[in-house]
Amino acid sequence: MSWSIVIAGLIVGLLIGMTGAGGGALMTPILILLFGVTPSSAVSSDIVAAAIMKPFGGAVHYRRGTVHMGLVAWLALGSVPAAFCGVFIDHALGSGEAMQQNIQYAMGAAIILAAAAMVARMLLDSAGRRTASQAGDGPVAEIRVRRLLTVGIGAFGGLLVGITSVGAGSLMIVLLMTVYPQLSMRQLVGTDIVQAMPMVGAAAIGHAMFGGLVFAITASIALGGIPAVLLGAWLSSRGSNFLLRPILAFVLTASALKLLGLGATDLAITMAIVALVGLPVWAFIDGRGRPAAAWDAAGIARRRTLALVSAGTPVGVGFITAALYFGRMRPAIVQAASQDAVPASEPFRAGSPVSTRV
């Protein structure tokens, strides 16, 4: 057992619990880039650890009633066989060094998708897809399951998880958000965690059959991750993680580009551009999606802040303002909106007709 991997598992577990991000996108690159674990062993060990950890989070959501079991069944119908197929593809990509490199490149591409999904999730939230009235646990909304599409989503996620261990978190949640906007975020997260249990279990069995599993790594991840996930979930209900999400998306992008073979200098330049431009753009889009009345109620100048974010980007002022927006302004604006039931700004007005086509 490696205590350094235990500590890494603890940190990753905290981030998973606080943000709802997928563990594979976080832990697997750490094993490869920091601990020198081969990609195939990193994927196998992380998936088996996830299979051990998922039931803890799933049990919490099931007791809270935030799981749509109908969706779980149809997602599992696609994800379980696809996860097995992903494992087979993993070992059909080649042998020796060629296989390891192919798995690493596939993982880098999947993590970029996960980072993009995390950004999309926050932008969908800011666009009014999740209102204050949908934030609570509450009973699961009555929906008609779109069976074929749901099975397809499960198959897509299962295939990615089987190959790379990435995809059970942010990617699946964003896909479900677009298909089932009636479900609250907690219900989406709960449904995703429970459906991931059979999917990850199938992938874990497949990897154990093919070899590559390092029990010491799996045990170290689980030892640090299980209590940390529970602690992170507890902390997330008592504090803001608005700034944590863009930081996490940034780190995921950097690790993905490194896995894809980008050199240190090119990586530093690329990530500097991403930070200096991406964060202000994100803040501007998110800020414009917040109702002006909520800005006023929070005592924050909307027009001036958005002007600094946009016009100040070329000289770095936009980046600083965007960081302040996500860290301090946005939580205050969201709180003001929820307390005063402020209607959302155009084009998503509260009370406006929302399509419920399923």
Residues of each region from the PLM?
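Juxtamembrane transmembrane-helix boundary motif
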Residues: 1-8, 12, 33, 62-159, ...
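Hydrophobic, aromatic-rich membrane-embedded alpha-helical segments
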Residues: 160-171, 175, 302-328
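Membrane-interface alpha-helices
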Residues: 193, 197, 319-347
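Amphipathic, cytosolic membrane-interfacial segments at TM-TM junctions
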Residues: 285-309
